[in-house]
From Swiss-Prot:
Assigned keywords, A-Z: Cytoplasm
Functional summary from the UniProt entry: May be involved in a process influencing telomere capping.
Record's protein name: Restriction of telomere capping protein 5
Native species: Arthroderma otae (strain ATCC MYA-4605 / CBS 113480) (Microsporum canis)
Keyword Acyltransferase: no
Length: 668
């Protein structure tokens, strides 16, 4: 009781503007290093516009500094002009935690501090809860939750924003620039998660939770507002292009080298992703429930590129140049051309290691798409940010369409891998229709027999679970079941057989002499999804289920990608897509840096204990060298036996008894 009274007295008479300023100062002192804060201040002050006593950035300044398209239509029809969308987001986030009152905010230094902290996930140093609420905050910034067109600008800012200032056009013009559905009713029935946990945590840290709790109480508008597909499409285009971005890289390099082919690939990728949000008429936009569920379940890392983008604000070229001048190590011409940020040529994805085959499937857009949902390490799951590199293991276009070639290249790879398959859907009559791209993430080595798949797997980290997914024409993700260790031995993660082909997530029947050539020996679907590729590598069956039509399997149902989370079906539903295969590629995952000292992975380059070869590529090459030596040894034995027919038969019999050749060979 006494604590509540103390809280009230502390916040009594304090306005939201003052509390917002206090929070910004707390963020600045606890979430940035002194050097980062000095760089941020230099960047802001060197470009800030001024009206009276207010220093601020407008949309043009922010877009120019970040190096993102600002609506000038340079990139085709403007679907990559994300500057207005980004400024719309920051003018909402800058009002945190008083979005309902202060949004849209003027982008002052305080507002910019809060924007950077929220978009780079640094708020954990100040706010001890509200982690899950970031999605709600991002939805609000896109859906314009809390903005009121009639809301006057605060008195201390209205005088400093005449009608012809860029700042006014950068905030108010955007309100009418995007189609946002407004609430159709004002139901007062509250849900359990109506509280904005992140805003509550901010108020709690300011000892003002009781006084200002009513301001951040999320009303029904957050659940009834919608993000227009046009708004989200522009943001997605930016995220796809900048997915490989690192903090020390210039964003302009990613845009300057875009051509029509890469733009078209990015558009296709964005359209495929948008299908997972499309549960009705696109004119109505994306609701909060759909947005939150799809992001959480199938696109958890989609906003990761915003972190390095806004961390650019923490590096000032001016301060770097001043250091060079003070040290006297650079000439005036060097100072003019010097830039602390490195360049990257995004035309060839740097994630692929040299020496790999020329991919028929992988491009920058596909890699970006994979990075939005596929965890490959811990604690940094994003494959474009955690040092992951891809090594070409198998390509049907390069190595041939045969199980022998697949076996030679894939079964000798003992590290995690990603398999990608492209082809065309086949209708019931067998005719090819639209193209499709599917794939699977296998977090451990492939096995040729199902018996080895019954071993216990360490599932302490998300990246140790398998994934089955569809990239086009729809975005569908089926995550591996956390209870995979409790599954029966006839439900392996992967299975390889010359009789049935390649099976992922299928139920494998027991082998019998009478069923070797019958359908009873064929793998069958299980769980939420499975993939079966025939021995000729020509056709595939991609199976998806809501989990009620089959027994538990390796993969969970696809979730929001195929059904609404609030209206889960109680009846069995499944779909089998028949595919005519064009290309199959398997890419091995190699970690070029040590991600975690506590990682249980055996495939790190740092794992050299007991003389183990530390690199999966080297281990595979060593295995091939061993096979080559054994083949040479068998050839020499054959030649030494003699050339006669009877002698040749005798020599062959000796080799079979030794287990070197024949059906019981150890080297097959």
């Amino acid at each position: 009781m006494g604590a509540g009274q103390s809280t009230d007295s502390k916040a009594l008479g304090t306005s939201p503007e003052e509390m917002s300023h206090i929070l910004a100062r707390r963020f600045a002192s606890k979430c940035f290093t002194p050097l980062e804060l000095a760089h941020l201040k230099d960047n802001f002050n060197s470009l800030a516009l001024k009206q009276g006593d207010i220093r601020y950035w407008n949309e043009e300044v922010l877009s120019r500094f970040l190096g993102i398209p600002d609506g000038n239509g340079k990139f085709g029809d403007g679907d990559l002009d994300a500057g207005p969308v980004i400024f719309r987001m920051v003018s909402y986030l800058g009002a945190f935690p008083f979005q309902n009152t202060l949004a849209p905010s003027v982008l002052t230094f305080d507002a910019l501090v809060k924007v950077i902290v929220l978009l780079t996930d640094r708020y954990g140093k100040v706010l001890r809860r509200g982690k899950k609420d970031r999605i709600k905050l991002l939805f609000g910034s896109l859906a314009d939750v809390g903005r009121k067109e009639e809301l006057p600008v605060p008195d201390n800012e209205s005088k400093d924003k005449p009608d012809n200032t860029p700042n006014k056009s950068g905030t108010q013009s955007q309100t009418a620039g995007f189609s946002i559905d407004k609430p159709s009713n004002d139901n007062d029935d509250e849900e359990d998660n109506d509280d904005d946990d992140l805003a509550l945590a901010a108020l709690e840290s300011l000892d003002a939770i009781e006084v200002f709790k009513h301001d951040q109480r999320i009303d029904r508008t957050v659940y009834e507002a919608h993000v227009s597909f046009d708004t989200f499409q522009r943001l997605l285009m930016l995220l796809v292009v900048l997915a490989p971005l690192r903090t020390n890289e210039e964003t302009s390099q990613y845009f300057s080298q875009l051509n029509e082919d890469s733009m078209e690939a990015a558009r296709r990728c964005v359209e495929n992703i948008l299908t997972s949000f499309d549960i009705g008429d696109r004119k109505s936009g994306i609701g909060y429930e759909t947005f939150s569920w799809v992001i959480s379940s199938s696109l958890p890392y989609i906003f990761d590129p915003l972190t390095p983008l806004f961390e650019h604000l923490l590096f000032s070229k001016n301060l770097d140049l001043s250091r060079r001048r003070d040290s006297g190590t650079s000439s005036p011409s060097e100072e003019k051309n010097a830039a602390p940020l490195s360049s990257l040529t995004p035309s060839k994805p740097s994630i692929t290691l040299s020496g790999s085959f020329e991919s028929c499937i992988l491009d920058s857009a596909i890699i970006s798409h994979l990075s939005f949902f596929l965890p490959t390490s811990s604690p940094i799951p994003n494959l474009l940010q955690n040092g992951t590199r891809l090594h070409g293991v198998f390509s049907s276009d390069t190595h041939g369409e045969s199980l022998t070639s697949f076996s030679h290249n894939v079964l000798t790879w003992d590290a995690p891998s990603i398999m990608l398959v492209t082809g065309a859907k086949k209708d019931p009559s067998g005719d090819e229709t639209e193209s499709i791209t599917i794939g699977a993430y296998i977090p451990r080595a492939w096995k040729s027999s199902t018996s080895a798949s019954a071993s216990h797997h360490d599932l302490s980290n998300q990246f140790q679970l398998p994934y089955l997914f569809q990239l086009s024409p729809n975005h569908v993700v089926m995550q591996g079941s956390p209870s995979i260790n409790s599954l029966k031995a006839n439900r392996p993660m992967v299975s390889f057989s010359t009789k049935s082909g390649i099976a992922i997530g299928c139920k494998i029947p027991p082998p019998t002499r009478t069923s070797l050539s019958s359908d009873s020996s064929r793998p069958t679907p299980a769980g939420g999804g499975s993939l079966l590729i025939d021995p000729a590598l020509e056709n595939a069956e991609f199976f998806m289920s809501n989990g009620l039509s089959h027994e538990e399997g390796v993969f969970l149902p696809a979730g929001a990608a195929t059904w609404s989370p609030s209206h889960s079906s109680s009846t069995a539903a499944s779909e089998t897509i028949h595919i005519s295969i064009y290309n199959i590629e398997v890419w091995g995952i190699v970690h070029t840096v040590t991600i975690s000292k506590h990682s249980s992975s055996k495939h790190s380059r740092s794992s050299t204990a007991n003389g183990a070869i530390p690199d999966a590529i080297m281990r595979q090459q060593a295995h091939w060298n061993f096979e080559a030596r054994e083949a040479e040894r068998r050839r020499e034995i054959h030649l030494n036996v003699g050339g006669g027919d009877s002698e040749e038969q005798t020599g062959r019999a000796l080799l079979e008894m030794a287990g070197i050749i024949g059906s019981s060979s150890r080297y097959r």
